[in-house]
Curated annotation (Swiss-Prot):
Membrane topology classification: Multi-pass membrane protein
Top-rank lineage group of the source organism: Bacteria
Any one GO CC term of the record: plasma membrane
Family that this chain belongs to: Belongs to the UPF0182 family.
Residue stretches spanning the membrane: 6-26, 50-70, 102-122, 157-177, 200-220, 244-264, 266-286
Keywords: Cell membrane, Membrane, Transmembrane, Transmembrane helix
InterPro entries (alphabetical): UPF0182
Localization annotation: Cell membrane
Protein name, entry field: UPF0182 protein Ppro_2689
Pfam family of the protein (one): UPF0182
Entry keyword annotation includes Transmembrane: yes
């Protein structure tokens, strides 16, 4: 008795703790949605989860309990005789005493578990309720694509649930009948009462109908199969498995009926023959015959028989990853680029990205981190109108790193150090005389060296803001350091949940497991707690059904406020005949741009692709969550860009799926690949350039292709980002009858250049680390430039400095101190001003005599450096001598 009470107490305590945990999460989450203004999203999801969970739980509870009650009311004669049956017959009285009181609790526990599972099916339920027609039908079954996206998942769930409910009811019913004596085990076999047989017959008949429904759904699931060559239903599936599933759909309930009749009448042969026939047909029609058909008919004539199904796979994969909108344009390369062409494309030249993300991040960290507790997490690429010029820039937010605080305690981490401060912002191609980046915005407080102003530099919401903070307390917040002392601030934004009651303080003290929130005298009724500050967590909390890009980027709006833009994707694994990527996804769209204010955490979700069928359904599911892209402020819309990761994914699929002819696809005649330097494939890169046939420069994302297992260029893919052209993708294809150098071939030519190789060797011997930047392919007019920056660092922890720029064109490769000098050397024309650090910066009208003296001085200094063993200095003087001689030759 005491033991039973102890168990009961443990159960009650466990249930109470679970309930309190649920209520705690529920209440604090509700307050978060109140803060963000998306309570309708919270309630819609809550009602859907509750309704779905209760529906599944209620059906299972009613179904199992009904069968248990029917089994419990049946009366059977007592099998009291023979002792010989004692080894097999249960002790009925003891078993009844145990089983009878457990019936309802067992059904309730099962219903509770199924209810939790059912609550997770809320999205499928809402998908079905809000489904829309796509307008495109699958080529095999003739169903609208929307059926597979929105209806089939729920049908599969209901079928699986019905099967589980019937099997559970069958098991529990057999158990009760066995205990009550309706099913008696003896040495002579199993004796089943007529009432039991009739009950079990009905259950088995219903189960056969569920199995038939499963066979019917298997017909549609064939469109998600794979035969190794392509995805989707193939010849064998359509001509063997599909007819078999259709026959089984009809035979299964007939076999179930025969089984039920045989069981009802006690005719065991009739009961077993029909199900056995279904099993045999399934094995032959789904396993044996398709294998024979594939081996002896399809394999010898594969292309001829599979061509229509390969065409289906190509069309639907292109639909799934938005490849069908890519415009293919021939690009006939010539090598007649002139200085006049370079001058006409000055905006493109000035926006070639010389600063790589990794070296620039390290340089920013050493030059602009200011204090150890600030950190630059990432560098983002964007474009701005700077001093009237359309410019590509690199921007990095200066966030607060709690791990690097000099004194880590609750007051410092939660009340004082609450936010990061400002940004570092500069051009992608300009270099100071020391080989360092130039800045448009820098320092704390922000200093603007251009017409970009940051008026609200505080960053309360960012990529490193992983912990809660409490603002408007009695403790001043740290804003930024100065030479004369620290500057403090008080939060003036709308973010956070007001701590205006004891109940809220208790709730958040429990959620964050600290009594300090409850006991601290620094917290007043005017204070607010800000949580879910990590921008990725914040947007996922509101829209967990979207996949968010892991590379958010910050922009400065016209008012000088800092905003985060995060690309969001809709996705599905339910597009028939489409090749899936890792994780099973075979449909994906970049349909949403999420915006988060870095100061007050305000959220907005804008639909950037209204043609996406999934976002149309989500918009119906959650009215008020999404806004049209036309509602986005112009100062933010100017910074919307085509996402790097999405184009990378599309490019990976496009390497094969640019081939639309089934024969070419089958033979892989024109298979492409993304070129690689070393082991890592090239990634798409942003640049500003004038596309062929266009009249103005624009911000694009670019990635080259090479033929499979070859190094020459095959094409380049570009995604546009500006204005009405946003989202338009073009593939420029090169002639296949001549060689166009690819990145790997250019890289090899750079390595083979004697002067460049010698210079790299000299730097390495000196102990410097040479960092070779990304090799960029830049289309200019109908030609291609290849540009690679070189960085030097004293050691692996040293400050990277951009010391040289390598440019290749046609058969020429040059290395100069900056891009302008390299282009002038290749194409001539007006010489660009040289940096102040150049030791040879002289007036172009210097007399030959003076140039000769300068050349002799450089030569003598080079010899002196050689004798001293200073090979780096020797190389520098040779470079200086070369430049003087070139000036003399002009």
């Amino acid at each position: 008795m005491i033991k039973n009470r102890f168990i009961l107490i443990l159960v009650i305590v466990a249930l109470t703790v679970s309930l309190l945990s649920f209520l705690l999460a529920f209440c604090t989450d509700w307050l978060f949605f109140v803060e963000t203004g998306f309570t309708s999203v919270f309630t819609t999801k809550l009602y859907a989860q509750a309704g779905s969970g209760l529906l599944f739980a209620g059906v299972l509870f009613a179904g199992t309990l009904l069968n248990l009650l029917l089994a419990g009311k049946a009366v059977f004669p007592t099998y009291a005789t023979p002792r010989e049956a004692g080894d097999f017959r249960p002790r009925l009285d003891e078993a009844r005493r145990l089983v009878k009181p457990l019936g309802i609790p067992a059904c309730a526990i099962l219903a509770l578990l199924v209810g939790q599972w059912g609550a997770m099916q809320w999205e499928k339920l809402l998908f079905f309720v809000n489904r829309v027609s796509v307008g495109t039908t699958d080529p095999v079954m003739g169903r609208d694509i929307g059926f597979y996206l929105f209806t089939l998942p729920l049908m599969e769930t209901i079928t699986a649930f019905a099967g589980f409910t019937l099997l559970t009811s069958l098991f529990l019913t057999v158990l009760v009948y066995t205990v009550r004596g309706g099913i008696c085990l003896s040495e002579r076999g199993v004796a089943i009462d007529g009432t039991v047989r009739r009950h079990l017959a009905i259950l088995l008949l219903l189960l056969s109908c569920v199995i038939a429904a499963g066979f019917h759904l298997d017909c549609f699931r064939l469109l998600f199969s794979s035969n190794g060559i392509f995805h989707g239903a193939g010849y064998t599936d359509v001509h063997s498995r599909l007819p078999t599933y259709r026959i089984l759909t009809i035979l299964a309930p007939l076999a179930g009926t025969a089984l039920a009749i045989g069981l009802w009448k006690g005719a065991w042969r009739m009961a077993l023959l029909a199900p056995l026939a279904v099993i045999v047909l399934h094995v032959i029609g789904i396993r044996v015959y398709p294998g024979l058909l594939q081996k002896f008919k399809v394999a010898p004539n594969e292309l001829a028989l599979e061509a229509p199904y390969i065409r289906n796979n190509i069309a639907l994969t292109r639909l799934g990853f938005d490849l069908d909108k890519i415009e293919t344009i021939p690009f006939d390369v010539d090598t007649q680029l002139s200085s006049a062409d370079i001058a006409r494309n000055d905006a493109t030249i000035k926006n070639i990205r010389l600063w790589d993300h990794a070296p620039l991040l390290k340089t920013y960290s050493q030059l602009q981190q200011i204090r150890t507790y600030y950190r630059f997490f990432d560098v983002d690429n964007d474009r701005y109108l700077v001093n009237g010029r359309y410019s590509q820039v690199m921007l990095s937010p200066r966030e607060l790193s709690y791990a690097d605080l000099p004194s880590r305690n609750w007051i410092n981490e939660r009340l004082i150090f609450t936010h990061g401060n400002g940004i570092t912002f500069g051009p992608v191609s300009r270099i100071s005389k020391e080989g360092l980046p130039e800045f448009f915005v820098k320092d704390i407080p922000a200093v603007s060296l251009a017409d970009i102003r940051v008026t609200r530099p505080e960053i309360y919401f960012g990529e490193l803001s992983n912990e809660y903070v409490i603002v408007r307390t009695r403790v001043p917040e740290f804003s930024y350091p100065t030479s004369s002392g620290n500057i403090n601030t008080t939060y003036a934004g709308t973010g956070g949940v007001p701590m205006d009651s004891l109940a809220k303080r208790m709730l958040f003290a429990a959620r964050f497991r600290t009594e300090k929130i409850l006991l601290s005298s620094d917290i007043t009724s005017q204070s607010s707690i800000i949580f879910n500050r990590n921008i990725n967590e914040r947007v996922r909390a509101v829209a967990p059904f979207l996949h968010f890009d892991d590379d958010p980027y910050m922009v400065v709006d016209d008012r000088g406020r800092l905003k985060w833009i995060i690309d969001a994707y809709t996705f599905s694994d339910r597009l028939p005949c489409s090749k899936p990527i890792k994780g099973g996804v075979n449909y994906m769209r970049n349909s949403v741009k999420a915006v988060v204010d870095a100061y007050d955490g305000t959220l907005a979700f804008y639909i950037s692709d209204p043609h996406d069928v999934l976002i149309r359904v989500y918009d119906r599911m959650f009215p008020g969550l999404f806004r049209p892209i036309s509602a986005m402020p112009d100062d933010l819309r100017r910074h919307v860009r085509y996402p790097h990761h999405f184009l990378q994914l599309q490019a990976a699929m496009y390497t094969a799926y640019h081939m639309t002819d089934p024969k070419v696809f089958y033979n892989k005649e024109n298979l492409w690949q993304v070129p690689a330097l070393g082991e890592k494939p090239m990634e798409p890169y942003y640049t500003i350039m004038k596309l062929p046939g266009e009249t103005a420069e624009e911000y694009i994302l670019l990635l080259p292709f090479t033929p499979s297992k070859r190094d020459n260029l095959a094409a380049w893919l570009t995604a546009r980002s500006d204005g009405a052209n946003y989202g338009k993708i073009r593939a420029y294809t090169f002639p296949r009858d001549r060689l166009i150098y690819g990145p790997k071939q250019i890289d090899a030519r750079i390595n083979q250049d004697s002067f460049i190789s010698q210079q790299l060797t000299l730097w390495n011997q000196r102990g410097s680390e040479v960092i070779r930047g990304s090799l960029l392919v830049i289309p200019i007019e109908k030609s291609l430039l290849y540009v690679q920056p070189l960085f030097l660092a004293a050691d692996k922890a040293g400050l990277p400095e951009l010391k040289r720029v390598i440019v290749a064109f046609g058969d020429q490769v040059v290395m100069e101190e900056n891009l302008e000098q390299a282009l002038q050397r290749l194409f001539g024309g007006k010489r660009a001003p040289e940096p102040a650090s150049s030791a040879t910066a002289k007036d172009s009208t210097t007399s030959p005599a003076l140039l000769a003296k300068e050349a002799m001085a450089a030569y003598e200094k080079a010899i002196s450096q050689q004798r001293q063993g200073n090979w780096s200095g020797y190389g520098e003087e040779l470079r200086r001598l070369e430049q003087i001689l070139r000036r003399m030759a002009q």
